[in-house]
Amino acid sequence: MANLKSLAKDTAIYGLSSIVGRFLNYLLVPLYTARLAASSGGYGVITEVYSYTALLLVLLTFGMETTFFRFVNKEGGRDPMRVYSTTLIAVGGVGVAFVALVLGFLPQIAAALDYADHPEYVGTMAVCVAIDAFQCIPFAYLRYRRRPIKFAALKLLFIGLNIGLNLVYFLLLPALYARPAWHDVVACVYDPSVGVGYAFFINLACTALVTFFFRRELTGFRYVFDRRLMARMWHYAWPILILGIAGILNQTADKMIFPRIVEGPEGKVQLGIYGACVKIAMIMAMITQAFRYAYEPFVFGKDREGDNRDTYARAMKYFVIFTLLAFLIVVGYLDVIKHIIAPGYWDGLRVVPIVMAAEILMGIYFNLSFWYKLIDRTIWGAWFSGAGCVVLVAVNVAFIPTYGYMACAWAGVAGYATAMLLSYFVGRRYYPIRYPLRSIGVYVLLAAAFFAVMQWLPAAWPLWARLGVNTVLIGLFAAHAVHYDFPLRAWPVVGRYFRKRS
C-alpha cells in the first residue's frame, strides 16, 4: 500500500502539469473556435498540423525516453550521467539533422502537405518539434531524479506563456488594430493576414524559451557519447519506436486521413468540427498521461526490488475506476461543458463519449504493456500497436466516405481494443498478472448502465432536471467505489471518524 501511496502522490503532482495544464489550454479551444469560424476551416488547419507534429515527436525521440529509464535504472548505479549524456547527444543530433533536412526541402515538403501557400507553417513546426523532442530527455531526467515540482512548473510555464500570447494575438491585438488610434502602432507587431499562423509562431517562441530553464540539467557534467551503450540502447529502443509510431498513429491517423478522403475546404471544415469536439474528450488523455508520468519510473524502479505483480494489478483497477468516473462526469455535464467551443462546432459533440471510451482502452493498454518492457521483449509492443494501427486505418478508409468523422471516432475504439486484447492474452503467457477482472467488470457494467440512462433521458426535459438525474447517477457510481474499494475509514484526516472504536 505504501508503494501505491507513493505512486498516487507522484501522479497528483505530475497531474498538476498535465490535467491543470491541459484544462488551462482549453482556453485556446473557445478562443480559436470563436475567432476562427467553423466554415473557414482554420481550426481544421491547426488540427491537421498538430497531428503531424505529434507523429514527428515520436520519430525524433525514437523511444529514448522509456529507454533512458530502463538503462539509468539498470546501469545507472555505476554512471547515470553517461546514460543521460549519451541520450541527450543522440536525440539532439537527430533533431538538428531533421531541421536541416526540412528547411533544405521546405517548398517540396509544404507542397506535398497541401500547404504550398504557407511553407512557414511547416518550417516553424519542424523547428518547434525538434526542440520539443530534445526537451523530452531533460524532462525524463527530472522524473528519474524524482523532481516533479520543477517538471510541473516548467510545463505550466509553457502553457501560461502560450495562452497569454494567444490571447494577445487572437483577441487583444485584433481589437486594437481595428481602432484608428492604435492601428499604426499595432501594425508593427500584428498582421491580420497571418491569421492561424500565429498559433504556430507562438508555440515555437514558448518552446524555445522553456529550454533556457534547463540550464542545470544541461550543464555541470561532461558530455560523453558511449557508442557501445548507444548500440544496446538502440536495440532496446527500436521496437519502442515502432510501438510509438503505431500508438501515435492510433491517435492522429484519422486527422491525417480525413482531409485526404474528404478533400477541399469542406474537409478542413469537418476536420475542424471533429478536432474541436475531440478536445472535450481529452480529459481522459490528461488522466492517462498523468498516470503514465508517475507509473513509468515507478514500475522500473520497483522491478529492481522484486516481484510487484499484485501492486500492478491493483493500480490497473484504480486506473479503471477513476477513468470511468471521469467518463460519467464529462458525459453527465456535457450540456454545460460544450460551451467551451462555439455553437458552430456542436454538431460533432456525439463523438465525445466514443473518443473517451477509446482513450480508456488506450490507458488500459498502456498499463498492460509493462510486462514486455520489464522482460526486455519490447518487440511485442510493436506488434500489438501495429495491429491496432492497421485496424484503425482500415476502419477510417472504409467508413469515412459514408459516415464522416463518426468513423474516425469508432476507428479509435476498434484500434485500441485490438491492441489491448492482444497485449492481455499474450501477456498471460509471458508475464501473468492476476488482474481483478470480476471487480473491474462490475465497474464497467455499472458505468455502461448509467451512461445508457443518461443518453435515454428525454431531450424535452429542462436542463436542471437532466443534470440532476446525471448527478445522482455519478454519485451512485462514486458511492459504490467508496464502499467496496476506498472505505472512508482508510482516508487521511476524515478516516478517524469512520474507524470502529475498540
Where are the regions that the model predicts?
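Transmembrane helical elements of multi-pass membrane transporters/channels
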Residues: 10-25, 199-214, 218, 227-300, ...
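Membrane-proximal transmembrane or re-entrant/amphipathic helices at the cytosolic face
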Residues: 455-502
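Specific pore-lining/lateral-gate transmembrane helices of multi-pass inner-membrane transport
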Residues: 73-90, 273-385
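Signature of the first transmembrane helix
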Residues: 3-66, 95-103, 128, 163, ...
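Interhelical loop/hinge segments that connect adjacent transmembrane helices in multipass membrane
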Residues: 1-7, 177-198, 208-251, 294, ...
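Interfacial/gating helices of multi-pass transporter permease domains
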Residues: 29-54, 119-120, 192-198, 232-236, ...
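Hydrophobic alpha-helical transmembrane segments
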Residues: 123, 152-218, 386-391, 405-426, ...
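Membrane-water interface segments that mark the loop-to-transmembrane alpha-helix transition
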Residues: 9-21, 49, 58-107, 116, ...
